[in-house]
């Protein structure tokens, strides 16, 4: 067990319930940790509704790893059962239900992407569970017991439900079951702490209530912030194009991270690295480069990160790509959302739409050094493209500006 607890608060938005000055382990997570009589069970549930994980997701897994390093057991719950419903939190419409095959395929991809973050090797540090183990076998009597622990009013107060109800948008009964099933996960694995984003407080609180209902000691909730994406305004999301995927190649990852807006750099260092926040470089450009190098090293190794840094530098400083020689194109002249082939044809490179499509399909178009391979990829908003460079072939470059 570590005797330094600074890791607990770093990047943490809220712990509940929490009276940090108290010595009572029932109301103070720090007191529970300092008690040290046994490893705590730290629950994190993930619903594999997609195949990719991005840096916004990584925040919570980094915190889980910190608990592992402090000697506790990470209980990673793969929501193979709940993913078929989908978490309705914050959603303005019903989620598409996935097949069991979809979920299993996504889960395997998730676990592969998590290997650079979590400790999969040390005995007792990681427990991987699938919530179909206990949810698939629930009989009607048990389901009615779960439903009896909450009121319709409590459910409608949940983010997303009330908005849809007020607008007359359907809210289906199976969606009401989602927070109860997530809460029952906490009963099944007897978690001491549950990690989640700030949008998960309701669901985690339901878990506390259900643990109390079934005679267990209620878990603590530890909430982590939602990472703002590369556009500097909206949460990181693949659909918005403002993300950095964990499975991206080193150069693509580096090129994106060295352009993180200045206003976000401090948050990115706090949430995505272990760098001493008091010892960061004073020069903003140097901070961006250090951030990119650190994060890429975590997922690709130091050697690959250094190579990516060199390649990125050559991209903007080589004889054909002097930064000052790259023309700029205002994104205000592009209609969004925009498909990739339309974007490439619209930014002053002298290509028709059909030519742009062929160039993309032939692998001749890059965005910040990463190949664009789908001419129909949709860029939702211009903010995610600010400052990025489109390259066609070896000699055509344009920098996108707002």
Curated annotation (Swiss-Prot):
This is Tyrosine--tRNA ligase. It catalyses: tRNA(Tyr) + L-tyrosine + ATP = L-tyrosyl-tRNA(Tyr) + AMP + diphosphate + H(+). GO terms for cellular component: cytosol. Residues 338-402 form the S4 RNA-binding domain. Keywords: Aminoacyl-tRNA synthetase, ATP-binding, Cytoplasm, Ligase, Nucleotide-binding, Protein biosynthesis, RNA-binding. CDD domains: S4, TyrRS_core. SUPFAM superfamilies: Alpha-L RNA-binding motif, Nucleotidylyl transferase. It comes from the Bacteria. One of its GO terms (biological process) is tyrosyl-tRNA aminoacylation. Homodimer. The lineage of its organism: Bacteria, Bacillati, Cyanobacteriota, Cyanophyceae, Synechococcales. It is found in: Cytoplasm. Gene3D superfamilies: HUPs, RNA-binding S4 domain, Tyrosyl-Transfer RNA Synthetase. InterPro entries: aa-tRNA-synth_Ic, Rossmann-like_a/b/a_fold, S4_RNA-bd, S4_RNA-bd_sf, Tyr-tRNA-ligase, Tyr-tRNA-ligase_bac-type, Tyr-tRNA-ligase_bac_2. A motif ('KMSKS' region) lies at residues 235-239. Belongs to the class-I aminoacyl-tRNA synthetase family. TyrS type 2 subfamily. It comes from Synechococcus elongatus (strain ATCC 33912 / PCC 7942 / FACHB-805). The gene is tyrS. Catalyzes the attachment of tyrosine to tRNA(Tyr) in a two-step reaction: tyrosine is first activated by ATP to form Tyr-AMP and then transferred to the acceptor end of tRNA(Tyr). Its EC number is 6.1.1.1. Its main location: cytoplasm. ATP binds at residue 238.
């Amino acid at each position: 067990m570590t005797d330094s607890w600074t890791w607990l608060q770093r990047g943490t938005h809220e712990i509940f319930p929490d009276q940090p000055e108290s010595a009572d382990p029932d109301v103070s997570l720090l007191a529970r940790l300092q008690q040290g009589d046994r490893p705590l069970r730290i629950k994190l549930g993930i619903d594999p509704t997609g195949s990719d994980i991005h840096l916004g997701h990584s925040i919570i897994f980094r915190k889980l790893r910190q608990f592992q390093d402090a000697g506790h057991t990470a209980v990673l719950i793969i929501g193979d059962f709940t993913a078929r419903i989908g978490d309705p939190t914050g959603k303005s419409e019903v989620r598409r239900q996935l097949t069991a095959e979809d979920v299993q395929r996504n889960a395997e991809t998730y676990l592969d992407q998590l290997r650079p973050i979590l400790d999969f090797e040390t005995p007792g540090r990681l427990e991987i569970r699938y919530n179909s183990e206990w949810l698939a076998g629930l009989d009607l009597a048990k389901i009615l017991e779960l439903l009896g622990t909450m009121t319709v009013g409590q459910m409608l107060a949940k983010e997303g439900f009330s908005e849809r109800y007020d607008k007359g948008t359907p809210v289906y009964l199976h969606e009401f079951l989602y927070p109860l099933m997530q809460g029952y996960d906490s009963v099944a694995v007897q978690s001491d702490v549950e990690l989640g984003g700030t949008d998960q407080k309701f669901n985690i609180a339901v878990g506390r209530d259900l643990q109390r209902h079934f005679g267990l000691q209620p878990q603590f909730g530890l909430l982590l912030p939602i990472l703002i994406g590369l556009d500097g305004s909206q949460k990181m999301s693949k659909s918005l194009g403002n993300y950095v995927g964990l499975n991206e190649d080193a150069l693509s990852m580096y090129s994106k991270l060295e352009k993180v807006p200045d206003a976000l750099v401090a948050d990115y260092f706090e949430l995505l690295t272990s760098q001493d926040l008091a010892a960061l470089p004073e020069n903003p450009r140097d901070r961006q480069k250090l951030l990119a190098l650190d994060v890429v090293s975590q997922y690709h190794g130091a050697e690959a990160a250094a190579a990516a840094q060199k390649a990125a530098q050559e991209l903007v400083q080589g004889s054909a790509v002097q930064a000052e020689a790259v023309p700029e194109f205002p994104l205000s002249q592009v209609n969004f959302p925009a498909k990739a082939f339309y974007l490439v044809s619209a930014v002053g490179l002298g290509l028709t739409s059909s030519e742009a499509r062929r160039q993309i399909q032939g692998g001749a178009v890059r965005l910040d050094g990463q190949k664009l391979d789908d001419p129909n990829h949709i860029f939702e908003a211009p903010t995610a493209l600010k400052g990025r460079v489109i390259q066609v072939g070896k000699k055509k470059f344009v920098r996108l500006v707002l």
